[in-house]
Every structure is written in C-alpha cells, then in structure tokens.
C-alpha cells in the first residue's frame, strides 16, 4: 500500500502535477475553481505484487480559498505564508486491500488466506516549504481514524525543471516510513495468516521501507482543457522486501489524465 501521490493515495498513486504547479506559481492567491476529468492507470495489483492491473478513476478538484476537495486526497485546507511555508490538513479514505484480484482497489489472488485490509478513513498532515519557485520540500504523516492500521510518513522533495504558460514538468521523490503496526498491516504475515495462506510468518520492523519517485508532465490546451502524464517508480527496502508476500521490490506505474476546468 505504497503512498502514491500519485500515492494516487487512493493508494498508490499520487496525481500531483496540477497541485505542484499551483504551489510553484507565485502569482495570485487561490480562487474558487472546479475541475473534473478522468485518468487511466496501469499499476501493480498491490505493493510488492508482480502482477499488474488497469483502472479508470474519476478526477475531481474543487477549491474555494484555502479549502479544497480532491478525489485523490480527500477534503482539506491549506495555509500558506509569504515566506513559502505551508500547512495542509486533509481527511481522506483508503480503500484497503483484498485477498483476491480486484479491478477497483489493491488486491490479488496470491493473497488468498491473508484476509482483507479494511477500508479506513484517514487524516493527513503535511508541512512544507517552497524554497524557490522550482523547489519544494515537504514532510507528511497519514493516520488512520476508523481502524488501527498504523501510521505512515514520508519526506519528499519536488523539483520543477520546466514551467511555461502551457507546460509544466515536475519531478518528485519521497522517502517512505511506517511504524511497526503499519508495516505489519501491509507487509507482515501473522501465524494465523500463515496457516491459512501457506506463507511463512513474517514480522516487519518499523522505520524506513522504501522510496517513491515520479515524473509528471502537464499541458494546458486551453484555459479549460488540460492533460497530464505521469510515470512512478517505487523501490522497497529490506523491511518490506523480505516479506514473503513481496514478489517484486521495484515497481512502476503510469497515469494519463484529462481535466476540464469550469
């Protein structure tokens, strides 16, 4: 359950191109906007899977001043200072993981006997600093509210090597961390799960468990129509990599999306 901003936290994947553009632009303060669209994704069936799936997800982004709604991050608000420091707080939803193949959330038949990871409401706090118009650093913590699945953290940097009136290229990289409960929810195999699935028991240690990097290009066709393309690479460290349910420790995802802004 790698945090994709792509995160798409729906999990995975993180769609951050437009948000990155907004933070990097030191023009006018946020105004009321509404954008809707669709994105197609090719991604692993779950964090550590060696199989892939395709999915189409709706994109909704609405903002009124400091408050926003985002189909990937949830609802929230952000506060920004003239110095470049900002605080973001969101309330979102994680779809969990199934122990069979799924077309709409993480899951695989290879996890049969492991049981499902419940969907959960979560809250996330992020603190960042836009050091220059082309470089932002951020720390983020995501905590579950409706189920005790542990806390995950990430420390990230976003670099914008190119930005014009119509095109933005952004590169982001993040170090991923999780407490012991989170790591064992996602990568651990309990004695009971071992008996039911046939996998060897495994207790994952908390701490650093991987990196997540993405390259995103967004293009503004007209004031209303925009498109984005993103490629994401995730690498799992030994604390996750040594789990018997991890069959591939380096994974890629790809996203293509179209947005219409009213």
Give the role of each language-model region.
Residues 71-170, 180-206, 239-240, 246-248:
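Outer-membrane pore/translocation modules
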Residues 171, 218-262:
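Predominantly the C-terminal beta-signal and adjacent terminal strand-loop region
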Residues 43-45, 94-98, 144-146, 176-182, ...:
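Structural signature of outer-membrane beta-barrel domains
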Residues 38-42, 58-64, 73-79, 125-129, ...:
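Residues on the lipid-exposed face of transmembrane beta-strands in outer-membrane beta-barrel proteins
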Residues 1-33, 49:
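Cleavable N-terminal export/targeting peptides
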Residues 191-238:
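Glycine/small-residue-rich hydrophobic helix-like segments
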Residues 25-77, 86:
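Short glycine/proline- and aromatic-enriched beta-strand/turn motifs that initiate or cap beta-hairpins
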Residues 28-34, 54-56, 65-67, 83-87, ...:
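Outer-envelope beta-barrel architecture signal
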């Amino acid at each position: 359950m790698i945090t994709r901003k792509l995160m798409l936290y729906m999990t995975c994947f993180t769609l951050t191109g437009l948000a990155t553009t907004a933070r990097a632009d030191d023009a006018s303060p946020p105004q009321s906007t509404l954008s809707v669209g669709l994105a197609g994704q090719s991604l692993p069936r779950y964090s550590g899977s060696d199989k892939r799936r395709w999915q189409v997800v709706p994109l909704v982004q609405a903002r009124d001043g400091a408050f926003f709604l985002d189909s990937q991050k949830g609802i929230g608000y952000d506060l920004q200072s003239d110095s470049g420091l900002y605080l973001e707080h969101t309330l979102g939803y994680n779809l969990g993981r199934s122990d069979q193949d799924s077309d709409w959330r993480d899951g695989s038949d290879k996890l049969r006997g492991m049981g499902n990871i419940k969907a959960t409401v979560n809250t996330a706090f992020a603190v960042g600093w836009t050091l220059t118009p082309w470089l932002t650093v951020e720390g983020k913590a995501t905590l579950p509210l409706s189920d005790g699945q542990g806390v995950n953290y990430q420390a990230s940097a976003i670099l914008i090597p190119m930005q014009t009136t119509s095109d933005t290229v952004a590169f982001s990289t993040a170090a991923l961390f999780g407490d012991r409960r989170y790591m064992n929810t996602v990568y651990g195999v309990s004695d009971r799960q071992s008996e039911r699935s046939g996998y060897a028991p495994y207790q994952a240690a908390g701490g650093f468990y991987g990196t997540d990097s993405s390259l995103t290009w967004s293009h503004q066709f007209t004031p209303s129509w925009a498109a984005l393309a993103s490629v994401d690479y995730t690498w799992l460290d030994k604390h996750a990599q040594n789990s018997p349910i991890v069959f591939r420790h380096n994974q890629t995802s790809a996203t293509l999306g179209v947005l219409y802004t009213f």
